[in-house]
Amino acid sequence: MTNRSAAERSSVFVKPFLMTDVPASSDPAPLLLSPSERPLPLYTVAQLRALEAQGAQGLPAHTLMARAGAAGAHYLIERAAHDGSLAGERPVWIAAGPGNNGGDALVLATRLRQAGIAAQVCMPVEVKTDDARWALVEARAAGVPISHVPPASLDAFGWLVDGLFGIGLARPLEGVFAELAVEISRRAGSHGRVLALDVPSGLNSDTGDRVDGGLAVRATDTVTFLGAKPGLYMTHGRDLAGAVTVAPLGLYLPVADDVVRLNAPTLFAPHFPARAFASHKGTFGSLAVVGGDTGMCGAPILAARAALQAGAGKVHVAFIGDGAPPYDPPHPELMLHPPGALALDAMDALAVGCGMGRGANASAALAQALACPVPLLIDADALNLIASNTALADTLAARATSDHAEPDAKRHPCVLTPHPLEAARLLACTAAQLQQDRLGSARALAARFGSVIVLKGAGTVVASPDGRAAVNPTGNAALATGGTGDVLGGIIGALLAQRLPSYEAALAGVYLHGWAADTLTAAGSGPAGLTAGELAPVVRGLLNRLIYPGRD
């Protein structure tokens, strides 16, 4: 990152670059971007409003609406050409709201009609904005059938289009709009095709929550305009938006250093170490997994096994309680140690908290780990100890500036991997409050503790104390089972031991962890019934495919 001030960085957002200012009718085919493996910037409503206002000043009237509707139509036409979803002259049914989202929908209907595709519009109330009125005139001139009530059944339509409300919705869907949202969502839930324009109606595009806890449309596909939005990838947004495609509409925004990104391999892959022939086990670091009080040995072993398969050179398990096994039969490569037998400060990285409990042994082990000048991952019970113990919390925060930390401390802040309840304890709020602003909560924790935060959940957020943040697009409900968090901790710990910077280690860990779940689910091992132990071998394969492809 550069050393510009926050004000200077944020000022980048108000200077959009415009494509050639030509009338909408002569625009080329719309550019549609798939977010897959792209570190796209994720824009808030406020940022997009600034972009849209400035961009519209340099364009002929109605151009952005014309481009948005054309992008939606182009997406439908391309999809239908590949999957036959409009075969047999099945028409498209379009729900248009009173604002600019409804105007986008009307333009889409006009473009479909001009392309010879039957389209019908349901417009429950009259449109209210100047741009939308223009779009209505164009649709009527093109002969688009427009009614004020929906048909008795939507089953005859090839696609349904949600153009009710976009990012400007500030209150829950009510009345006829709520009824339409239910009907449209029912179609998506029964394997029908639903396209949302910009965002599913009723979704808060900043947070991924439903607006004020109300209803929201469930879509199978979303074409989002100008730029991607964080709410499409977090909490309910992932279920409601379906497959997301970005239509920039010819406006390109220079990206500030601290803008939120969609996590992608280009953000972390360059930081992996080379695997030269002249390497040995010490080259790729020694990790100690610290945890496993009496009766809780499984969690650290899961983490340690994952660390082995994520490329760490040597992996130790430092148990803190009695009764630990002498070795791990499936993985005798792991080195298991009874309490107090391993010199933690001799390790290249530590992963602390798995199966640790909250007793005296756990507090002592965490305090010892915090005093070690090595990269440190903190998970599970260790996070709960920090939340309940002011001295431990202050010690963690002090590591960010303490002289006792490694010389490269800014490169290797601690990594904390809380789930929402653990994060809420650290912030002294409720989990519900935290979930209302996952990005803000993760950034607040990063600032409070001078640490990289991995806020787990649907759309895991990774936030750095230097202001960088990303939302992870991989993973699915298969990860909602015991032990998967331990596996994630082991993966990130292994990457810290291999000397990846903390932020990039966290990005890589959550991406690979989620990708492994996606891969297993696609192969039939999920989303129901996947076990944590299945993830690590798949992570190994994906890591080698992505970072270390075979030599010719």
Predicted regions, residues:
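Internal gly/pro-rich beta-alpha loop/helix module
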Residues: 159, 164-258
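Small-residue (G/A/S/T)-rich helix-start motifs and N-terminal tracts that mark the onset
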Residues: 4, 11-124, 217-221, 227-380, ...
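Generic detection of intrinsically disordered/low-complexity segments and helix-coil linkers/edges
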Residues: 7, 11, 151-153, 159, ...
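N-terminal small/polar loop signature for handling phosphorylated ligands or for N-terminal nucleophile
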Residues: 107-188, 325-343
